[in-house]
UniProtKB/Swiss-Prot annotation:
Coiled-coil annotated residue ranges, if any: none
GO BP, sorted A to Z: regulation of DNA-templated transcription
Organism encoding this protein: Sulfolobus islandicus filamentous virus (isolate Iceland/Hveragerdi)
Name assigned to this protein: Uncharacterized protein 13
InterPro entries membership: 56B_RHH, Arc_rbn_hlx_hlx, Ribbon_hlx_hlx
Gene of this entry: SIFV0013
Pfam family, one: 56B_RHH
Length: 50
């Protein structure tokens, strides 16, 4: 994804405990939730698209 690429909203449902872990991680690492999720999806797909 490039910085100029159009962004769209993407809603999902996740377990409450996972959301809590994500929020804690983001707070401790000064990251935005949307950035962590985007990075995780990019990494996940890169590993499986080979």
């Amino acid at each position: 994804m490039t910085e100029q690429e159009e962004k769209v909203s993407f809603g999902i449902t996740i377990p409450k405990s996972l959301k809590t872990r994500l929020k804690i991680y983001c707070a401790q690492n000064d990251k935005k939730i949307q950035d962590v999720i985007r990075e995780a999806l990019e990494e996940y797909l890169q590993r499986r698209e080979k």
